[in-house]
A protein has these predicted regions:
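Helix-start/capping segments and mature chain N-termini
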Residues: 193, 226, 230, 297, ...
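Extended alpha-helical targeting/anchoring segments
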Residues: 1-351, 355, 469-471
């Protein structure tokens, strides 16, 4: 179906009191404006909407699966070498003055296995976006966890919030805050954001009442599970009589997914990209009677083709003269991490020593719990937590025990107790892990009920008390239930947190008191140290007997 006739049907439907819900693919841009260059063939319809007589409000995610695990093996449609060649070509065009910035993208593809709604639930849970959408058109299913508002219309008020500027999330709170500040102060990202915001101002100016275009927010930093994003807000008063086709012709595709200037950048995109974008970087949304509307930019979005049992997911970044190929490629990988990361349906956890009615290192436990809650976006009230623990302790008569405190995402606290007599503290046997952990795994830096890394390590070496972990650079990290300490010539050393390990509260206490020194420890050094200890706030120092482990086969 042609683009304008399709939107005329949408306009007719809303004029007759119906709601229209659907999507417009990136390749529809040529249908709005013929000189906007795109691919001419794709499996998806260019425009697809369905109509409803009424709309219902539902609780988001109420009918979706509660847990999700990725089932697809994703393959890039482009090699790193080809990616680099395309970035170099874009930079040459910038050098020649033909463009200032180009949004360069590629696809991840996979055979689709599993349930479409389960896949959608996983994306929503992993991305925590305000514009999630599930559209089932029979053969074609579009699932989106977009964080970016394309435009919203409420009466005569029009608002757009272009998103341009990205930095990966840190692995723990302090690193995370440092990365946020780096994005906010990044000259490259600020320049990109201003460029795209100016384009949006100009595009919206076509639709707006004279003098009404404003930019109330510039360089706002928004937090998402895998990345920090920089956004700006553009507002205007919509002129009388603007139809949905007028709005799309003026604004589509969103400037944040093309580059500047739009026409030449889209020509370059058509030259360097290998395949059509489809729904990716198009838009998804609804428009209702009277013209109220909300559309997202279709990023963090996948297209499932049921006939082919195939799923397609796009990623990209804005290439400028100052771009680093490695940094841009890493940004694309960061944006794709929501496809790979494990289900984050876990509680935050603290394991606490209770002695004679007193909690050992209570403030440090609270500090770590609060830090992780802030990082993951969990609800946490420190005073409520203190009173809950205090009330629990008052009811206990055991002189020495271990408390296990769990904090849910909604802020609910649960506590259970284990008598200390059942805890082995004299010495433990241990062996080196059979394979390395990934130092970039964020779960390593937070104490949670997701113990999959440690459970896997323990399962590979049975008949041993503990497993000593190391990362992909063969740097020793920690044990499954405690931090690593080694003694060398009378001094005590422990690996730095950046190697990929939990910042233990007893470890922090010992470092602050000058009894422990941070130092990178290599896997091949372990046999030459004088003594090895496992430490945590319940057991304190436990001597380790390191043995050669045998893999369970």
């Amino acid at each position: 179906m042609e683009v304008f006739p399709a939107l005329e049907k949408v306009q007719s439907a809303i004029d007759n009191g119906l709601f229209a819900v659907g999507f417009i693919t990136y390749e529809a841009a040529s249908g709005f404006t013929p000189y906007l260059k795109t691919f001419t063939s794709q499996t998806l319809p260019l425009v697809s909407f369905v109509f409803f007589a009424e709309r219902n409000q539902i609780i988001a995610g109420a009918e979706l699966p509660k847990t999700y695990r990725p089932t697809a093996k994703w393959n890039q449609t482009i090699s790193y070498e080809d990616y680099k060649a395309s970035v170099d070509k874009i930079r040459r065009y910038i050098e020649l003055g033909e463009t200032y910035q180009v949004n360069y993208t590629f696809r991840l593809q996979a055979e689709f296995k599993g349930d479409e709604k389960g896949f959608y639930a996983g994306l929503c849970h992993a991305q925590s976006s305000p514009f999630c959408a599930y559209l089932d058109f029979g053969r074609h299913v579009v699932v989106s966890a977009s964080p970016e508002l394309f435009f919203r219309i409420d009466g005569t008020n029009l608002e757009a919030r272009p998103m341009k500027g990205t930095f990966r999330r840190g692995r723990w709170l302090q690193e995370d805050e440092r990365f946020k500040k780096q994005l906010l102060s990044s000259e490259k990202d600020r320049a990109e954001n201003v460029m795209i915001t100016d384009m949006m101002r100009n595009d919206i100016g076509i639709l707006a009442q004279t003098g009404s275009v404003q930019v109330p927010n510039l360089f706002k930093i928004e937090r998402y599970p895998t990345v920090w994003q920089m956004t700006s807000t553009v507002k205007a008063s919509l002129r009388t009589g603007a139809k949905i086709s007028d709005i799309m012709r003026a604004l589509f595709p969103c400037a944040s997914v093309t580059g500047a200037p739009k026409v030449r950048s889209m020509e370059i995109i058509n030259e360097v990209e290998k395949d059509p974008r489809g729904i990716y970087t198009g838009c998804i949304g609804y428009v209702g009677p009277g013209g109220d509307a909300c559309f997202s930019v279709a990023i963090r979005t996948a297209h499932i083709d049921r006939n082919l049992r195939h799923v397609n997911y796009g990623v990209g970044s804005g290439v400028t003269w100052n771009s680093s190929t490695d940094a841009e490629f890493q940004e694309c990988k960061d944006k794709a991490r929501i496809l790979y990361e494990e289900d984050k349906n876990f509680d935050l956890l603290e394991t606490i020593l209770l002695e004679n009615g007193r909690i050992f290192l209570f403030e440090r436990h609270l500090d770590r719990l609060e830090s992780s809650a802030k990082y993951w976006g969990y609800k946490f009230d420190r005073s409520t937590c203190i009173s809950t623990i205090t009330d629990f302790v008052k009811m206990k008569s055991v002189q020495r025990s271990r408390l296990r405190l769990c904090l849910s995402k909604s802020g609910e606290i649960s506590i259970n107790e284990t008598p200390f007599s059942s805890i082995k503290i004299n010495s433990l046997t241990a062996a080196l892990a059979t394979d390395p952990i990934d130092r970039m795994n964020r779960l390593l830096f937070h104490k949670t009920t997701n113990r999959s890394v440690y459970e896997h390590a323990k399962s590979q070496i049975p008949n041993i008390d503990e497993v000593l972990l190391y990362n992909q650079d063969e740097e020793l990290t920690e044990f499954c239930i405690g931090n690593l300490v080694v003694e060398i010539n009378g001094d005590l050393y422990t690996p730095p947190v950046s190697c990929g390990l939990l910042p233990g509260v007893f470890r922090a206490e010992e470092i602050d008191n000058g009894r422990l020194i941070e130092r990178v420890l290599k896997k091949d050094q372990i046999d030459s140290v004088d003594k090895i200890y496992l430490i945590n706030s319940v057991r304190r120092y436990v001597p380790i007997d390191l043995r050669a482990g045998e893999q369970d086969v």
